[in-house]
Each structure stands twice: as structure tokens, then as C-alpha cells.
């Protein structure tokens, strides 16, 4: 039996060691022959010699590839040839892999990150733990003497206990007379004795409980201190335990023995409120063990009284650990055999890692190449696998009888196997049989077994076997299969040949491009951003949109392009021509769309045949808008030679000295001039008109600093270039001088300028595109000409000519031309516009020659009337009516032919055909247009017919011919066609797509690049000659690997099938068998949430977390997150970080509410989103479980049950980082400077000095900060500036630091984000300095009010973030009246940051200034401490008002594991397979019989391995919410969820009463009896008839006493003990009684051992109100009972008969 493997190095070579147990003996086998290797995929095999010649360095030694062997492997379902590169030593791999990967011939390298010893197990097919050897197990535990504040390992180990199958004993160094205790002379001898025990017993497995993090590291540290060699292993060279890092945690390895730490196994396996050894022992084995608190251990050891009790406690720890080890070890051994790795590894691995190791082993056995894990830059992202997208039925409340529980056996694995869900079967073309996933629509080939399903078939059987062996305690197979979502990546070879036309929207402009040229150009310009996967290149983009259609609603949509894709291709291509003249060239695997049975389906290139029907556009919807042309911008790309005589002018009226005055004003605004000009208001008014600033009653506010900066740059140029032209009373500037700054012109200002030639015609710079301009462009594109010729004087003459023979048309041409370009000349057959500006505009918009004419983008994006005007004018020039009465448009340009089809489709004209004859493209239109109309009946085109094949598929009968829409309606209305089936074809009439028949398919060979787009959501785009819809490659996770084996499509499909089968089963059991199923929610995008990403705290808008759509379920879109944790609140009231697997968004179609906390602090939530309110009362009840006071509440419920919401109020990061005193002073100074200092600027002084104003506190600041910092060299010197307390501080480095980090580009003060990562002490120091400079302490009603006031709300928001990080609750509000200076309004408004947690602020931050700190502390002494959330991680904030607000756009939510809560805008909010059923009123026997009949029925309908199982029958049960219910089975066993009171801070009387209530309801079916039980207990408590031991409350000390800022009852007792010299360490359980009396509860609690019935009386009100009633109301509230109904003296209560369903 193999226990473990590792390797050692001898003579520079690795030797594998196999630790084994064979025939009862331990042995180590060696294998020196195994060599490390990786795989490399090469573009060209001839480069292999270059690869072998690559050199690397390891520890000063040159290393290289020893040998290379070419091998054939399978990779994600296809054959590949790779090179196996062999090395001398495993450490050569990390030294060489980067160099090899960088070689240009290397596509990628694989399997380079598999540890050498694990690789050996996989390759050799060795399975740890296989065999029948009997393993010896030994458990041990230590007790330590820990003094408060001691470092880890400082206190002595006072006892070591151990246990095996034979005995349980204790070793100690104080005399204890017990048969199982061995006494030695001191701690050193005790450790040596334990080492001897391990040697003598020679266990194969050493069991600990949290030994990785406590027992063994502590033992190692003490052994080192005492000079004892801790020989616990069987490796003679290295027998000491070794601490290894495993991710973020540590693990201890004992070579030759398996160190089995129960703690991570238990945490992974079972769900408990607390994981102490006592709690786990009782929960798993149903046994109890003695408990000792820290104060008792300390007292016993120091006084040496009750030493036997301590020894028994220690011995029981070891025995409990051993018994739990016996229970859990066989499960982990089975798991190790399945995975093929050691128990040491498996027991400490996450579920995801276990899956991966299993797949690696199977992949090797099947000759599959494993995909790579992500590197640091490409994080592995995981789908949450519990219920995402699954079916949830809200429970039926009330008490029910005779309930069956049905569950699917291995639901997800069964789905995977049944439907062959695997990356290599996903959407595989050419298969005969497919299974299609519901909702998501992915297809899985059934012609061959997929990689994953073929593995899972055996696993499902294994899982059943392991499940039996593990007694249902752990189910690793099911867990791993639920984690299947991390499987595979697949790159689809769906591609288009390069010369296909593609309409694309780039930066808002519609362009028609050749797909190959376009993608090549983008990739060439952004080489550094192109990612290569195998031979596929992917470029992510964010400025492109494509024309697409929605497959569900069959409507045209504009969708974002996520990526451009190309790859080299050699193989078959197909030229597909449709009857309309459309055509496209695609590869064999690329899909177009067809319709089958009324549904849109993909059909691949090699599957398309003549006569097939293909989806084409009927109407293309555009994002229409009013359009204008910026002529200077339009011509700015022309050469300087072409625009040499172009000028821009503006009227001089009202602009005297304007340009220089504006420049001086702008310079003053940017701080570059000290004095503002006298007439600056003139320029401020102009800037406000442009939208660059906002004028206030006094002063102004810049609305867009970036635009203002560019405007200043423009005027720097204009002021030096503009000239006054007195002849025309205008200012003039040569276009070429300012062409580089044209984009900096605000359009509103440009509207006042004109542009033209120096001595000729000028037109407005901004030209509005209306119907007349559309008509002018239509004339020009059809029969226009733009030319430039040399004239007689040697110059250039420019003209635009519009040709036509019809005088009426010439008159129309003349009118529209003169409207825009002034006087024109009309000749016999043309209109001549002899203006250079007309020439430039037409050339830039539409092209000059017939071959390159185009419809400009401004027409395609204009409103429909403008497009119609263009089309009418074009038809007048290049259109005619064919003898068949069809309209015909002609052009020599292929581009223009495609644009004309696009234009027609955008106007809803779909009866279009395209022809080509004698070098001319003809576009035929077979329907009436708005302008010319014909009365002759036209032939009906494909776009107005429903093909007979489609009719046959839908209605199941033959039709003789295609059917017109009119005829179709008649037959449906008359009932001759089934109306329900007809609905499948409504899209032909109302939708935006039509079907076009394939005329021919030509197969050809192609070699070269092929291209594709990744289009968001719809996964298709418009492409090809004449334009048709093609399926795109899915890109997102599919672009490049994020993990080994990952497939979003597979994950979604499994979930969708799971939902489908659960819904189907519930529907069938209710509709056909008469059962009733009893059991089976967002914020706005601007909401800021607190996250921790890769260890760093960030404050981000929730919408910024949503980077892309990874998948959709219904209308909800999901973005998978990796490495992201959210700040949340657990049920103990503590702030914790929990993983966020995804962020979700959907369009807001609900009411939105704004919850105001102050007039400047709010949160926006939808009507159904839950906030977390706090159930407050007039009394503080610190013993009550906080989680029960956290109530989900909708916005409109605020102010009723809940008046307070929750904000953070505890540090967000550890406070144990080492800090230095001088660094603290440095950050205090920085805070002072930010608050009351000045720095930066262009003066010489500002390069070396900072200014600081300290006022009357100058001497104090000097002594506390400036002198020490000068002594340490942080500042060079400081000089008093005046008698007002101002200093000049000489510190060049500090000046640079402040400039770089504490001012933004606009010169405003800011707080850099790196401060979030500083130690808490330094952040507090900064805040201390800042509040000392700018903070105030005022007294209101005797209570100090701490504020920080500023007019910059952004700055205060940053300060708030720092306060949240250090754990100080705060709020912000704004003044409603403007500030005044010398009696005059300044136009600014003060914002106040107000400290809520004044006590923590005073203790942790406070003020540097003694007078402020003294004032604060003096008034805090008499102020009342808020008790309602004392000692917890949150504070309360009251709702000011709730109002409904208008909102359009996305709303967001995140999934937070375990708590399902997160802080949005610093307010806590909620984020949002089997089933129970009954037949009301029926007898149990009939219900069971019917259930079994249903199982036979449903299992006959379920495909493959899917099977519904009968899991149990329950006599009675009630369901409160979907996570709170209780049922009782036929043997009287009660199962509860979400109702238990199992925490220590519930007294025994509360637990006991709740249990009796459950028994009364479930066993006797009487809610009235339950109520009587409660009243009886309440009466006994009130009359002091309850035994004292039932009133004891147990609470744990969780941290050092000095870290408790608020004093709860257990902390109060612990501090009293500490004051008496009794040491209390974290982990100590305090057991106390609450006494009757007045005052705080923490003053009225005593230890149970101190209670004297002659002197003391417990507080009955406390136990009734805070213990018993809350515990039972968890149940009885569901039946309509309230607190007042349950007191024994109350009147008769109403019953629950209405709830009991008979």
C-alpha cells in the first residue's frame, strides 16, 4: 500500500521515493529512472533542434533539454502531434519553460506545472491507499499555558495526550495520580517522552484536530526552544515535521507517516455553526466530552487543584480526536484511491483540485493532452455550482401531514452522461444525432461518447458505493461533479473567407468593409493586444458594433462586437449563392441559419445544399438620430496641399480681444496666471454656454476638466494664429494652422464659424443633414461627378456636376445645391457647382469616381425621411422601371450595390434581388416605393411568401406551393390551419427576417486566413454579398483558456437540463397524480461595493465588476468573477469576507426606490430587492443571536418592522502588521498637510518646500512631528513663516511624493488608492493628522460631535473609505445654504463627514492637538455608549426618507457565498434538487402507493441514467421559508433546517423549550400544545422554578481582551478574571448567569461557579424576552403568534386549525 511519494536529489539527479506499507512493514522504495518532461506544440517541426539548444540557469548551473521525442496525443477531441521535452531535474522545468515558450516556433507548452512526484503516480498508474494493509492510527492533542498577549509558542505545553485503539494517555510534568497519566520532570522531558511514544507505537497515520495550524507548529516551536529533536517521521534523513505552504494556509508533513488533520476535512464535509472539537464530536458521533474554560485551566495549573479534571479533559481531547479520525479517515482513503493522490494531499484539497487531479489521471490513461492552468494574468474563473439558474419553488407555509420526499439520484452527473455533455461533443458538426439543451439551446453530439461522460459513467457507480461506505457523511463524487463546470475549452473553427462584405459600426459610424482587410488592419495596429491560442488569433475590442438578429423574437438588433478572430485554414470552402443573388464564401464548419419546425436552427457550410432555405434580413433596424456634418473634421484628414487655401472665419462682432482674453482666463483657471483679467465674467459666460463650467451664485464649478484642458490648448493655438480681416469685419485663421486641434472645438462654438477658401465661397462649419441634403447626396451618388483640373492661369479649378436630361430634375438639383453651396450654373444636361468646398465635401463624403462612389454613413444613420429622400434622388439618377414593372437601381460599384440593399432593408423593403451584367450591378425591387408606384401586379418574391417546406414541417401535411401572407391569414382565421401551430410562423409576417432559397453550392479548396467576429448575446452578424446572417464564434471564455477543462456551454446546459427535469417532475406529480408540492431577487449600477480582490481592498461601482457577459439565463446576464470577495456580515454580527462567484445584471423593468440616509447618502434599489434591517428594541439584548435580528426588508416596508439599516463598523483588515513610530509620525504629517497645507505649482519654491498652517498649535506640532521627522531625516528642515503658525517645510522628496499622489491632474486634493493597502496604524495616523487640521469637535446636548468639513464631496468620499477600512462608522450630509465670505455668498456648499463611532475614533485616531483631544475625551466620559450593536462589526443608520425615482438601464446583484449579503453604498443588502409533496386529506398508505406509482411513471419518461428516488415519508411537517422548515419521520426522528438554536449563547432552557415546541407540533400535531408548553416555561421562569444549570449561557472569547472595544457580558467577566490575575486566552468559554437588577447587562452577569442562591437571583425578564421567546418565535411566528400571546398570564389564544391541512 502506497502512503505517499516524494523525490530527493543525489548527484544532481532526482530519485523518486515511494513510502509504502507491505506485509505489515514500512519501507521506502527508490526509482532513479523517472525523468521530468513537458510537451511542446510547434508550428514547424524543423525548429526542434533550436528548441533543444535553448539554455537556462538553475542555481548557477546551465540547464537544457536532454532529449525530445515526437508523440501523437489527443487534445479536446482532435489528434495533435507534440514534442515531449525531457529534462534532467524537475527544477529545470521552471527554469526553462519561459524561454521555450518565447521561441517563435512554439505555439504553446503543456503539462509543465504538474509536480514531479504526482506526475510519477499518474504516469506509472500507481494508486495510493490500494491494498489490504491494516494501518495503525494515533491521535494526539496538546494543552498550553497561554498568557494574554504572549507570542505564539511562548507559553509552555503543559500536557500532551494521545490515543489509539488500545489506550488513551496523558503526559504531563506536574504530579497527577491517575492510571492513564505519565508524569515527567519538565516540559522538555514531556516532549521527548512523546517522541518515544510515536517511535514505539510506530503509527502509519497521526491524527490531529487543527494540527496544521496549532498543535504541530506549536510543538515544533517549543521543541526548538528547548533543544529537543522532534523525530516524528520515518525518514531517517529528515525525520522532523515540515511546515509547508498550501495556497493561503499551512500544512504540516511528517515524512513516512500520514498526518491526517481532521479540521479541513470536517469543514468541507459537514455544516455546523461552530467547529470546536466538542461540537463536532457531538454532532458526528452523538457523544459529549468534558469542557474546561481558559480561566479554569489557568486556575487548575497554577493552584494545582483539580489536576485530575484537567488530565481527564486532555485525555478526552485525544480520544475524541482518535474516534473522529476513525470515522473520517476511511472516507478520505476512498477519495485518495479515486483521485489517485495521497491522503495528505486529498484531505487538504478543494473540490475543484480533486476534480482536476482525477481528470489528469484519466487524460493520461487515454492519451489526452491536458489543457493549461491560467497564469497570473489569466485568472482561473469558476462557476458556482449549487443552484445558479436552477429551479426554486417558494414553500407552502403551514403545518402539513403525510409528506413524501423525492430526490434525483446524482442529478448533474446523470444529466452529463445521459445527454453526452462534453466539450468534444458540444456543437460538433456532421453528427446524425444531437441532444439539445433546453433554454440555452446548445447541441451535444450523441454519435460517440464524450470525454467527460465516458468518465462519469463509472464514477456514478463508484459514488453509490462510496456513499454507502461513508454512511452518507461525505459525497465527494457528487460534489466534484457539481463542480464539473470547470471542464474544457473549445475553439470553434466557424469562419468566413476574407473578401466578404461586412457592415460594421465603428465609433458610431456605419462602414462597409471587407472582413479580411478590416480584421488584418485592426490586428496589425494592435499587435501587442492580440492573444494567440493554438493557431487562432483573438483581439478584444470595445468600439465596434455589428448588425444582428435575435433568434428568439426574430427581430433585428445592433449588438456589441466583443472580439475579432482569425486563424489559418486549409480545407474545403463553399461558395453559397441564393436565389436573390446574395452569396457568401464560408468554411465547412461555419453556420448560416435556416428554419425547422418553426425554430431558427444553424446549418453548417458543408451541410448546405441546393434548395435549402437560408435566413436573410427583411428589415434592418438602425439607431436613428438627427445628424450633422462637422466639415472641418470631415476634411481634416486631407493633405495640407489640398487644404492650403482653406480658412475658417468668425464674425468680429462682440469679439474684440476675445481670443487673448479667453486664453488669459483659461490660464488663470488652471493656476498658470496669478491675477484674473478684469473682464473675466465675459469669458465665464461663454464657457457656461459651451457646457464647460457651471456658474454659481458666487464663483463657478468646472463640469468637465478634460474638455476644458483641450479647449485651453485650442486657444493657445488660436490666440497666436487668428488674424483680423477688416474688410469683412471678421477674424480669420488658416485651416492648416489649427487642423490638429479641430476635434478640440466644442460643436456649439463651431456653429458660429464658417469655412471656405481664402478669397471665395464659405459655408457653415456645421451642416445639418436634412431631407434636402439627403436629396443632394442622392443625386450626386447616382449621377454626380467631382473633379479638379488645371485652369488657364496654372491654378486648379474645382467643380461638382450633377447630370440629368429632365429639366424638372435639373431644377430640383439646382435648388438643393444652392441651399448649401450658393449660386450654381445650370447647363443643358447638368448642374455645375464651381466651389472648392462642394468638391471637398462630396469627395470626402461620397467618393469622386463612379467606381468608388458610396452612400455616406450620415445617410445610413439619419432619420427615415432623410433616407427616403436619398433613395428617391438616387432612383431619379440611376434608377428605372423594368418592363416587368420592377424597379431597378444600377451601379458599377460592388460596395454601393451592398449599401443599396442595406438601405432598402433599413426602410423595410425586402423584395430585393441582385444581378450583375456587363460590368453593372442591378438591384431589383419588387414592391411599391413611396415615390414611383406601378399598378401592374408583380411576381411575389421570396420575402412575401411562406415556403411550402416550412408549412409542411409545422402543420405535418403537404402543401402544393408556397403561400402568401394574405392566404395564410385567411386559412388561419377560417380554422383550416391550426392557430397554435400558426403562431410558430408569425415571424414571417411580423418579424425582421425572411428566407432565401439556395440556388447553388460550389465546393472549392482554400488555404489562408479565415475570419470571424464574436458578437454579444445573439452570436450572429450580417455579412456577405447582398447581406445575410451568419453564426459567429462564441467568444468570452472560449477566446483563451482560463483553466484546465472549462466550458461555459456545458455548465449552462447541465443547469438548464436540471431545471427542466425538476420543473417537469413537479408539473407531472401535481397535474397527473394529485400531489401538492410544498417546497422545492437588485441595486443600481452606480452603487459602490466593498470588495477584496487578490488580497487588496477596493471600493468599486457594482457595474464596473461586470466586464462582459459570460452567459445568460433568461433576461439575466452573468459575469463570472475570480479572486473577488465581498465584505459581508455573518450571523454573529462580524464583518467577514466571502467569495463572489459572479455578478448578475438585467434591464430594470421594476420600480426603483432611493433610500435616503442623509441628504447626501443614499442607496437605489428595485422594489423587490431586500435590504437588511435591524430589529431594535428599547432594551439591549446582547445575548440574543444577532443573525435573528437581521431582517430582510423591502424598500416600501422600511419604517414599519424595521427603522434601522446596517453599515460597517469594524476594521476591514488585520491590525497585527508591525509598524514604526517614525512612520506613524510621517503619516500624521501627511494628513496635516492634506488638511491644512499647500504644495505643488511651478515656482522654484514649490520644488523644495511645502507649506503648513498650524495656527496656535504651532509649538505642539513642532515638538510632536517636525522635530522628530527632522531628526530622522524625513524632512530637511522647517522654518516659521510668520507669527500665525505657518511653516515652510524643506523636504524635496516629500514634495515629489505629495505632488505625485495627493493631487489630481486638475490640482484638486485626493487620496491615492494605495493607502487602502497601508497597515491600519498608518491609515489611522493619516486620519489623525487630517482631522487635527480640518476636523472639529463641537458639543451638542452634552455629546461631542466630530466632523470633517470640506466643499469637495469627492474628497470626503475618499476619506470615508479610509474610515470604513479602519472600522469607524460615519455618515455625510450637505448644507442646504451656500457658504458666505465677508457677507457675500461664495456659491459653494459645505459637506460634513460626521463620525458615528466616536468611542473608537477617540481610542484609535483622536487628535494630535491636545486641546481637541481633551475636549473630545472629557465629553465622551459622560456620553452614553450605544449598546444596541456593542461588540459587533456593524452600526445602525436610520432611514431619512424613501422615494420612488425614474430609472432606465441595468440593475445589478452579486452572489455572496454563505451570507448572501453585501454592502452597497455602505448599507447592508441581501442578494438573492429534491422536493417535498403530499396529497391533502389522503391516508399515508395511499400517498405512499401513489408516490411509488409516480416514480415508476416518471422514471419511465426520464432518459438515460436519470432517476427519481423515494427518499422518505414524513408524518408531519411545516415550512416557514425556503430555508426554514421541520419534518418528522415515521420513527419519530425530527429533521430541521434553519430553525435550530445551537449556538452557545442560547441557554439550555431556550434549546429545550424549542425542542418541546417542535415535538408538540410535529409529534402531536398540536400548535395549541406547543403554545401551552411555552406559557408553562415562561411561568416557571417568572416564578424562579427553573434549575440554575438550564439558565447558563456559554460564550466564547474570540480575540485578545485588549482588542474588545465594546464590552459584552462574557467579555466583562473575562476582564474581571484578568484583573484577578487569571489569564484568559482566545478560545476560552465563559459560562455565566444574568442577574436581576438595574443597569447594563454586562454589569449584572457572574460566572456559574460564583452564583450563590442566598445572595443572587437570576433575571426572569431577560430569560423570557431574550432566550425563550425568540427561540420559539422562530417557529410560532409562522402560525400567527406574537410575543404577547405566549406569556402565561395572557388571555386565550387563537389556534392554528386553519393551518392544518386535513
Curated annotation (Swiss-Prot):
A molecular function (GO) term: endonuclease activity
GO biological process, one term: intein-mediated protein splicing
Catalysed reaction, written as an equation: DNA(n) + a 2'-deoxyribonucleoside 5'-triphosphate = DNA(n+1) + diphosphate
Family matches, as InterPro entries: DNA-dir_DNA_pol_B, DNA-dir_DNA_pol_B_exonuc, DNA-dir_DNA_pol_B_multi_dom, DNA/RNA_pol_sf, DNA_pol_B_thumb, DNA_pol_palm_dom_sf, DNA_pol_type-B, Hint_dom_C
Keywords, alphabetical: Autocatalytic cleavage, DNA replication, DNA-binding, DNA-directed DNA polymerase, Endonuclease, Hydrolase, Intron homing, Nuclease, Nucleotidyltransferase, Protein splicing, Repeat, Transferase
Sequence ranges assigned to domain DOD-type homing endonuclease in this UniProt record: 776-909, 1229-1368
Biotechnology: Used in the PCR method because of its high thermostability and low error rate. Sold by New England Biolabs.
Similarity section: Belongs to the DNA polymerase type-B family.
Name of protein: DNA polymerase
